[in-house]
Design a protein with these regions (language model features):
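Conserved catalytic core of the tyrosine transesterase superfamily
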Residues: 1-234
Length: 237
């Protein structure tokens, strides 16, 4: 029966990682409930949700991922209504860390490595996710048009970003050392730096700048959005 799930997921273009996760969560549920899929009812579904939350003490976000996998199979593939009435647990929203403009400047001033400084500026100035930033290549940039292309953003979607005048100036100072247009902007031995390495750079910069907030890469993106709302002219800086 799960073969149908795998086939449908592949037809709809889900990634290999997502296909594997959906199959994994559905197998775990069937192992727990000890029934054939067509025999599963609403009580079974709720009992499993209670088990995940109360006994395994999984966080709502993790449970919701599992629930999405199960609902897709039972509702979309075999038209079983067992999970229709099961509501997703509420996920507590974390308040993002937002840095002041002064703190951003202090982080940049505290960073002596040119590549690390540009990495911080790029994420903040263009509002990039860390995964997007580390995967950027030189040929994703159009300096003349002051634009950049994100090829694999959230949901694997493409989008364009605006490059500020300051960022373009610093990119032009940094790029001459890179001759291959298909090269990653931020790389080590011709490979992109990892997300963990980028997080370490940002965390270290905040520490050197004397910032006591919990600062990770996403704080730069959150700060960009906040500052942009406060002053739309920043987009042209």
């Amino acid at each position: 029966m799960l073969d149908k799930l795998e086939t449908e997921l592949k037809i709809r273009g889900f990634s290999e990682k997502t296909v594997g996760a959906y199959l994994y969560h559905n197998r775990n549920f069937l192992t727990f409930i000890k029934k054939e899929p067509n025999s599963v009812d609403e009580n079974d579904a709720k009992r499993y949700m209670a088990y995940l939350m109360a006994e395994r003490k999984l966080k709502p976000k993790s449970v919701n991922l599992m629930l999405s996998s199960l609902k897709f199979f039972y509702k979309e593939i075999i038209q079983n209504q067992a999970f229709n009435a099961v509501k997703a647990p509420k996920v507590e929203k974390k308040i993002p860390t937002v840095l002041t403009k002064d703190e951003i400047v202090r982080m940049l001033e505290a960073t002596s490595n040119p590549k690390h400084k540009l990495l911080i500026e790029f994420m903040y100035s263009a509002g990039l996710r860390v995964s997007e930033c580390v995967s950027m290549k030189l040929d994703d940039l159009d300096m003349a048009e002051k634009m950049g292309k994100i090829r694999h953003g959230k949901g694997n979607k493409e989008r364009y970003i605006i490059l500020s005048n300051n960022l373009i100036t610093h990119l032009n100072e940094y790029i001459p050392g890179k001759k291959d247009s298909s090269a990653y902007i931020f790389s080590v031995n011709n490979r992109p730096i990892t997300i963990r390495q980028a997080q370490k750079v940002v965390k270290e910069a905040a520490k050197k700048a004397g910032i006591r907030k919990r600062v990770f890469c996403h704080a730069l993106r959150s700060s960009f959005a906040t500052h942009l709302l406060e002053d739309l002219s920043l987009i042209h800086i």
